[in-house]
């Protein structure tokens, strides 16, 4: 089964209520090589009316250096649970922590945000870890599309120092063909000044949107320098894609287990 063949109960309802993980849907689970730092998709985490489901992508078995997660030892496993799996639940901050509300503010989430929302918005990253998740962008029937994501690699641009940014500011995209790690990389810029990059897993989607028409990239939320670098800038992208295109789906995104 390809991840674009999800049952309707697992598909985000619409752009208006999706908002980077507010509704049930799917997250792409990615692994970062500990030395090469390359980020690759390895699995799909789904959230539906009956609970949670995890399956590996077929491509994960061919990924140099990657081994199945201890919680999910079998490539062909079809893992299901009414509760969020511990591997992902441990990446969600406990509401008992005194800094819980501050953490939600950094993610631009409401106080009643669900664990799924936290995971989708934050990416589930932790210090020294190699796992993160990405919400799959929504595409409407007319080809319009939107998604929110955190700007990547801010610490590597201008020493992590950001220019003045305000909610609603327009941002620019700039090609970086000289990037030795990924010639397809896209800089996120303010008045021509790079502040970071589009996350690697979003590049195909963003480039497809650019080829299909105008793309609007705006600032949704900005955190101060006390926030982790990967949480500094939350942005929203709006555009269109060709008929039939589904991000993070199709060839190369098939799972081992089919329904």
Residue ranges and their predicted role:
Residues 2-259:
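Conserved active-site motif detector
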């Amino acid at each position: 089964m390809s991840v674009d063949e999800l049952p309707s109960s697992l598909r985000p309802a619409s752009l208006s209520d999706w908002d980077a993980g507010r509704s049930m849907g799917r997250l792409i689970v990615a692994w970062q090589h500990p030395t090469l730092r390359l980020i690759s998709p390895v699995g799909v985490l789904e959230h539906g009316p009956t609970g949670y489901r995890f399956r590996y992508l077929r491509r994960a078995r061919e990924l140099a250096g990657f081994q199945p997660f201890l919680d999910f030892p079998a490539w062909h496993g079809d893992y299901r649970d009414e509760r969020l799996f511990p591997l992902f639940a441990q990446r969600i901050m406990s509401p008992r922590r005194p800094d819980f509300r501050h953490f939600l503010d950094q993610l631009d989430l409401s106080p009643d945000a669900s664990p799924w929302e936290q995971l989708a918005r934050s990416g589930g990253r932790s210090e020294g870890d190699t796992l993160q998740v990405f919400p799959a962008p929504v595409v409407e029937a007319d080809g319009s599309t939107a998604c929110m994501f955190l700007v990547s690699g801010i610490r590597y641009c201008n020493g992590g120092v950001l220019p003045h940014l305000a909610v609603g500011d327009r941002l620019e995209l700039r090609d970086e063909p000289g990037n030795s790690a990924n010639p397809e990389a896209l800089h996120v810029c303010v008045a021509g000044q790079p502040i970071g990059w589009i996350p690697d897993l979003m590049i195909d989607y963003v480039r497809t949107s650019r080829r299909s028409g105008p793309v609007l990239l705006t600032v949704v939320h900005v955190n101060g320098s006390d926030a982790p670098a990967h949480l500094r800038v939350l942005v929203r992208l709006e555009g269109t894609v060709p008929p039939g295109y589904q991000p993070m789906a199709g060839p190369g995104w098939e799972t081992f287990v089919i329904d």
